[in-house]
Amino acid sequence: MKLEGVIVATVMPFAKDGVNYEGLRLLLSKIVEAGYHGVFPTSSTGEVTKLSAEERVRVMQLAKEVAGGKALVVAGTGTGDHVSTIDIARKYKDVGVDAILITPPYYIQYDWAALYAFYKKVLDKVDIPVILYTIPLATGYNVPVEVFEMVAGEYSQVVGVKDSSGDFRYHLDLIHLLGKRLSVLQGLDMLFVPSLVMGAHGGILAGPNFLGRITLEQYLLVKEGKIAEAVALHNKLMPLWRFMGGCGLVGKLGGKWPTLYKLATQLVHGIDMGPPREPLPPVDDKDRRELEKILKELGLI
């Protein structure tokens, strides 16, 4: 499997009593109809760590149904140990997902040997396509490129690596050392176009939840060699990404990252996102007004 293009890390609409599955169905349908290459509902953006195992499975069953073979379906583990990672991966395999993204261990910062041992234990038991992942915002560390290199060299089911570090030097190392063997996928909207220009194969991104086809157009422009046009689109979106909090992950709005994406999706599509799962805070009135202003300037609402 060669992963290329734009896979959308979808936001998760909630009702008071659980996941709003009809709202999720509508959002997934819009993304698939827009022509995106894949959907990824059990993502960090989708608040995967706050979903029960049963909710994760049902969400992925719905995604598989809506995608209907038109888009890849990727599932995230959202777990921090090898036992629960293997368990949820097997459940996802039964659903029929196309690939799983493995969240690295979190809470404790691990050394190279411990990380390698984690991947080995998981990959010895999981035989469907796997995307490796680094997200220091959640784990407190960046998985060393050399660990990914060792794991990918040993396990043929590893097909890609998603980088949500925001560290572009690290990202270039991934492209240089792994890009001929694996799909290197950018995880931050702000860095998508620069990554493509430097040889990344695509991205797993949250912006397409509310940007229509803009992110897809960026990808296609770079593929067609129309770099200046892609950069122009990138620059047009910079006020949005700066407001969202520096790559949508860190900065002045830090912990509001998922909820800002959810609010933007609600404003653009009219899908009720419901409350965030605690302890995520709701967006306050000041930030809501600023977000509405930016979306209006972009012609999205």
Swiss-Prot record:
According to its UniProt record, this protein's enzyme class is lyase
Q: Which GO terms describe its cellular component?
A: cytoplasm
Describe its assembly. Answer: Homotetramer.
- Kindly provide the name given to this protein in its UniProt entry: Uncharacterized DapA-like lyase PAE2915
EC code: 4.-.-.-
Major place of residence: cytoplasm
Q: Which residues form the active site?
A: S44, Y107, Y133, K162
GO molecular function per UniProt? 2-dehydro-3-deoxy-phosphogluconate aldolase activity; 4-hydroxy-tetrahydrodipicolinate synthase activity
Q: Which UniProt keywords apply?
A: Cytoplasm, Lyase, Schiff base
Family under the similarity heading:
Belongs to the DapA family.
Q: Which residues form the signal peptide?
A: none
Instruction: Enumerate the CDD domains for this protein.
Output: DHDPS-like
Source organism, top-level taxon: Archaea
Localization per record: Cytoplasm
Pfam families from the UniProt entry: DHDPS
